Amino acid sequence: MTEVILFTQETCGACATQREKNEGIEDAYPDVEFREVDIQTDLETAEEYGVRKTPTTLVYANGEQTAEFIGIVDRDDLEAAIESAGQQSPGLAHRLTSIIRR
Protein backbone atom coordinates (compact mmCIF):
# COMPACT_ATOMS: atom_id res chain seq x y z
CA MET A 1 0.00 0.00 0.00
CA THR A 2 1.21 3.49 -0.83
CA GLU A 3 0.65 6.37 1.57
CA VAL A 4 1.36 10.09 1.18
CA ILE A 5 1.50 12.28 4.28
CA LEU A 6 1.59 16.08 4.00
CA PHE A 7 2.71 17.87 7.17
CA THR A 8 1.40 21.43 7.37
CA GLN A 9 0.44 24.19 9.76
CA GLU A 10 -2.33 26.75 9.53
CA THR A 11 -0.06 29.81 9.35
CA CYS A 12 2.20 28.37 6.63
CA GLY A 13 1.82 30.14 3.28
CA ALA A 14 3.91 27.52 1.49
CA CYS A 15 1.55 24.85 2.86
CA ALA A 16 -1.38 26.57 1.15
CA THR A 17 0.61 26.57 -2.09
CA GLN A 18 1.34 22.85 -1.66
CA ARG A 19 -2.35 22.10 -1.13
CA GLU A 20 -3.13 23.93 -4.40
CA LYS A 21 -0.48 21.91 -6.25
CA ASN A 22 -1.95 18.69 -4.82
CA GLU A 23 -5.54 19.47 -5.88
CA GLY A 24 -7.06 16.49 -7.67
CA ILE A 25 -4.14 14.17 -7.00
CA GLU A 26 -6.28 11.93 -4.79
CA ASP A 27 -8.62 11.35 -7.73
CA ALA A 28 -5.68 10.45 -9.97
CA TYR A 29 -4.43 7.84 -7.47
CA PRO A 30 -7.49 6.22 -5.86
CA ASP A 31 -5.47 3.32 -4.40
CA VAL A 32 -3.14 5.67 -2.51
CA GLU A 33 -3.95 6.83 1.02
CA PHE A 34 -3.48 10.59 1.42
CA ARG A 35 -3.28 12.23 4.86
CA GLU A 36 -2.61 15.74 6.06
CA VAL A 37 -1.18 16.35 9.53
CA ASP A 38 -1.22 19.82 11.10
CA ILE A 39 1.90 19.87 13.26
CA GLN A 40 0.41 22.52 15.56
CA THR A 41 -2.51 20.30 16.55
CA ASP A 42 -0.73 16.93 16.21
CA LEU A 43 2.83 17.57 17.33
CA GLU A 44 3.18 13.97 18.53
CA THR A 45 2.75 12.59 14.99
CA ALA A 46 5.18 15.17 13.58
CA GLU A 47 7.78 14.16 16.16
CA GLU A 48 7.14 10.47 15.46
CA TYR A 49 8.00 11.06 11.79
CA GLY A 50 10.87 13.46 12.57
CA VAL A 51 9.21 16.40 10.81
CA ARG A 52 10.39 19.86 11.84
CA LYS A 53 9.54 22.04 8.82
CA THR A 54 6.41 22.60 6.79
CA PRO A 55 5.40 21.73 4.26
CA THR A 56 6.98 18.29 4.37
CA THR A 57 5.65 15.47 2.20
CA LEU A 58 6.51 11.85 2.95
CA VAL A 59 5.77 8.91 0.66
CA TYR A 60 5.57 5.36 2.01
CA ALA A 61 5.31 2.00 0.27
CA ASN A 62 4.34 -0.98 2.39
CA GLY A 63 5.28 0.90 5.56
CA GLU A 64 8.74 1.94 4.36
CA GLN A 65 9.60 5.55 3.51
CA THR A 66 10.48 5.89 -0.17
CA ALA A 67 10.55 9.69 -0.60
CA GLU A 68 10.75 12.88 1.43
CA PHE A 69 10.17 16.41 0.18
CA ILE A 70 10.87 19.36 2.48
CA GLY A 71 9.30 22.54 1.14
CA ILE A 72 7.07 22.83 -1.89
CA VAL A 73 7.23 19.80 -4.20
CA ASP A 74 6.24 20.02 -7.86
CA ARG A 75 3.27 17.89 -8.80
CA ASP A 76 5.33 15.96 -11.39
CA ASP A 77 7.95 15.05 -8.77
CA LEU A 78 5.30 13.93 -6.28
CA GLU A 79 3.54 11.83 -8.92
CA ALA A 80 6.86 10.22 -9.88
CA ALA A 81 7.47 9.36 -6.21
CA ILE A 82 3.97 7.91 -5.87
CA GLU A 83 4.39 5.79 -9.00
CA SER A 84 7.82 4.61 -7.86
CA ALA A 85 6.43 3.69 -4.44
CA GLY A 86 3.65 1.72 -6.09
CA GLN A 87 6.26 -0.41 -7.82
CA GLN A 88 8.15 -1.21 -4.59
CA SER A 89 8.11 -4.81 -3.50
CA PRO A 90 6.70 -5.51 -0.05
CA GLY A 91 9.10 -4.70 2.78
CA LEU A 92 10.89 -7.22 4.95
CA ALA A 93 8.25 -7.09 7.68
CA HIS A 94 5.51 -7.91 5.17
CA ARG A 95 7.55 -10.77 3.67
CA LEU A 96 8.29 -12.21 7.11
CA THR A 97 4.62 -12.01 8.06
CA SER A 98 3.74 -13.91 4.89
CA ILE A 99 6.31 -16.59 5.66
CA ILE A 100 5.17 -16.95 9.28
CA ARG A 101 1.54 -17.36 8.22
CA ARG A 102 2.43 -20.39 6.07
Language-model features: locations:
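Non-catalytic, surface beta->alpha helical segment in thiol-disulfide oxidoreductase systems
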Residues: 58-94
